[in-house]
Amino acid sequence: MLGSAVADALGAPFEFQSGGLYSARFPRPVVGGIGEMIGGGGFNWAPGEFTDDTQMALALANALEEAGGFHPEVMWKHFRTWRSTAKDVGITISHALQSPNYFGAAEAAHEALGGRTASNGSVMRIAPVGVFGVRLSRAEAVELAVEQASLTHHDPSASVGAAFVADIIRGTILTGDFLGSVQSSFDFFAETPWGPYLENDFASVLAADFDPHHESHLPNGTVWTAVGQALWAVRTTTSFHDAVVAAIDLGGDTDTVAAIAGAMAGALYGVQGIPVRWATYVHGTVTTPHAGDVVYRGQDIINSARRLLGLGNAPITPPERPVQAKLVHPAGVWASNLDGAAAVPEDFGVVSLCITEDRFLNHPHRRQVYMRDSEGDRNPNLFFALKESVEAINAFLAEGRQVVVHCHGGRSRTAFVLKGWFMHHEGVLHDQAHQWMTDTWDLYETWTQTFFDLLDNEWGDHVEDITGGAQ
């Protein structure tokens, strides 16, 4: 869900324009400042603000949470409440949601639009179904995807596209195998009444050799092309970043194609595979039936997904006594704990390694890194999270900023990232970084063996590769 929201916000400024504009604007990754979250577009989105795609996905998630599953009246209530204040609503969805009652609304919209309701709005919001579907059987998850699509889109292709993507998301979360999940979805749907739609209407755009740059196809406002392009973007790349950029660079309905691709790529690469400069600034507002306007930021979207999985919100550890930030390296790198870091000047760069709630919203130069002080699979892409943290420190330093690195207590995660940065900056191995941290930071703790192992092995090899041999 976070992957979909991030991709949606990145694609929004380029919506309904020609292809290639993202890469023309950003020929290289922008690791400093607020990254590539520029905002703008036809609806003047704020930098990092997600669009109707994610707003509707969160409305759908809230409806699933309230009802414990699909309940058409509850979902209709959430959709119509969202629509009452939304500044961008797709044509098909807008027509359908004019009706106070869900029954017959999609068919009426279909007739009003001359039978053209095979649009991508049924799929742009599908990420919560893939997540919630982990708790359901495969058949139940597919049925849920079809039911939510049918509320607003009468054309069966809109339901099939939504169900196909939801099934891929669900399968990828469960197995970690994206390509295997795609093939499994083809095999599963072939045995259902929806199979002929994939085999006929979607066949060309879902083919393994589909190339959106060299084939004629319908606009990507249609469900067929949007799903095909999003699948292509993930299938032909090897990172979340590259998948989303590939989707946006196709032009047209960039936010929606990116949102669909981001949902699948997020399932594949996980929260730690999403560039932190993107996840830090994503935000938006959804009007809800019971709580009015609700502001969502990255952790709020993660919590929504957690609740759909039955996990509840991420636990918040009680705050500790603030520890005054300390300069630990003359390059301008500081260390602190959560509430100590919250007291640094607003022109500091802040690299946060824990849940911060609203403490740093007034700090324009910040990075929120998803990292858990745990062994096992709680950090499935720890190398990437460390690499992103180190790059953020260096980017802020290059801008002439002082940088504070912190976690909740300022102990294990803070030291892990600072040691990784020191190894990279000084071109040394972990034992020297360990000694530096021992001599420099009184709160240093070494209780997470996973952190030690990464610095000793994979990160050490990385430093040797980029420095020509660590000292």
PLM regions: where:
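Structured, active/binding-site neighborhoods that engage oxygen-rich ligands
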Residues: 1-318
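Short, cationic motifs built from Arg/Lys/His that form the positively charged side of catalytic pockets
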Residues: 124-125, 413-414, 441
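Short glycine-aspartate micro-motif
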Residues: 1-3, 350, 404
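Cysteine-based protein phosphatase catalytic domain of the PTP/DSP
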Residues: 319-402, 420-454
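A phosphate-binding catalytic loop at a beta-strand-loop-alpha-helix junction
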Residues: 400-419
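Charged phosphate-binding loop/patch that engages nucleotide di/tri-phosphates or the phosphate backbone
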Residues: 446-471
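Short glycine-/acidic-enriched loop or helix-start segments at secondary-structure transitions
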Residues: 15, 360-362, 415-417
